[in-house]
Amino acid sequence: MGRRAWVVFLAFSLVLTGCDQVFRNNAEPFTERRDVQFNDWEVPPDFLPMNLHVVGLGDSLTQGVGDELKKGGYFERVASDLTEWEGISFVETENLAKRGRRSDQLVEQLEKPEIQASIKDADLIFMTIGGNDIMKVLKANLFKLKTAPFYKELEGYEKRLNEIFGTVRALNPDAPIVMSGLYNPMLIITDEVKEFETIITDWNQAIETTVALDGNSCFVPVKDLFEENANVVYHTDFFHPNAQGYDLMEERYLKYLEACGVPEVLQGELDR
């Protein structure tokens, strides 16, 4: 390289070195610029929509028996309505309820690994249980009806219901449990059963107390729906609701889900 070329190269190098030094002197250390504040920016609730897994437990009411429109009773109706809630894009339902199931049979069902897996994965649980426990006593004492057998059975039912809640909570401590009360199907046959009406009221009180003690559950009363509309809400078996009866239950469930704060609980699941 010639002498002139060396001079040009040296001058060019000095210029680059000087520029680099200027940039270094003016630049903030990287460690001082790492914190970026997003405190004023909030993610909209529906920015990442939630897929909700809803599980049904219990007896024929949750199964939807008697619904001549085949719309899945109150369970599928309410589940469909949940897609309209903020932050929920899709609802997956898993109905594990079965016609005729009693509380002792539900206790046994909850011991099955596949059922436990479904409960662990649930975001929301609907349950009806107890009607068949009462019917068992009714059938056994049909021609000598007295109140004592119903209250003896109630003692066992309360213990089993507590066991059911305990099992579900051990598997899933967060999902709200929504449980309805019982109604009196005898009213459509005769109005001379005031003692039986008292029995239903006391059983409902036991259910409501258990639900309240859980702290993350919602009791939905439905007894009055069938008292006021007995001539139009029953299926032809005079025991299960028909489609209109399930429509009324749907409305009642939605009202109490809001009152119990279930949307806020589910939103909390979304935010976590």
What spans do the regions from the language model cover?
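Serine-esterase "nucleophile elbow" of acetyl-processing enzymes
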Residues: 28-97, 116
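C-terminal motif of bacterial Sec signal peptides marking the signal peptidase cleavage site
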Residues: 15-18
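Active-site segments of SGNH/GDSL-like serine hydrolases
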Residues: 165-198
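Bacterial signal peptide processing site
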Residues: 20-23
